[in-house]
């Protein structure tokens, strides 16, 4: 049985040419064009507060920039101390918790002859702190995990465009921005009425070298822990100082 093809019921020439709908769309475009051309649109009021003829969903970026909501996770930044150094103590907590593994840190240790500021109390600092913004999934776990409030995502700006992928890898000079802040975890803020020390010896700490761990205690304390000991009974272990002396713990290796 043959199938009978029906003709297009739109026999009107105006409907076939789409002229009415085309003119209607051009009219809307022209209306907004002349409204913006003669300055009838209010551009001084923030986008979220506009009403009437100025209430438009389209934002003329970059002349106008939308307001990011409170709590927006923007670009990362490293928070500086008063001396300009990053607050980061190279604890690797942000790099460990990052599900995208976009954070890379290399730690350095302050020498005993360092300046008489908080370097005597804070042991480590990052010699390298790198974030690959292309791999970041903007989850904010690094901010939550940091015990020193050293990394934040409160820049309220998105990742700007770049010409190469390497430009999306942010290092310390690119991340270190913003005003210095204080944090309750600072050693001189742990007790009420205490001040930032000018000369304080470090507490007992562990320094990891090539196969040896150098254990240092404050002057006047003894107990046989001031010598260099093997880093562990087997590979993948390191010694840690406690009140009872060095103990062996398993070192997590990626």
Swiss-Prot record:
Binds 2 [4Fe-4S] clusters per subunit. It is found in: Cell inner membrane. GO terms for molecular function: 4 iron, 4 sulfur cluster binding; iron ion binding; NADH:ubiquinone reductase (non-electrogenic) activity; quinone binding. It is a peripheral membrane protein. PROSITE patterns: 4FE4S_FER_1, 4FE4S_FER_2. Keywords: 4Fe-4S, Cell inner membrane, Cell membrane, Iron, Iron-sulfur, Membrane, Metal-binding, NAD, Quinone, Repeat, Translocase, Ubiquinone. It is an enzyme of class 7 (translocase). [4Fe-4S] cluster 2 binds at residues 98, 136, 139, 142. Gene3D superfamilies: 3.30.70.3270. Pfam families: Fer4 (PF00037). Its EC number is 7.1.1.-. SUPFAM superfamilies: 4Fe-4S ferredoxins. GO terms for cellular component: plasma membrane. This is NADH-quinone oxidoreductase subunit I. It comes from Myxococcus xanthus (strain DK1622). The gene is nuoI.
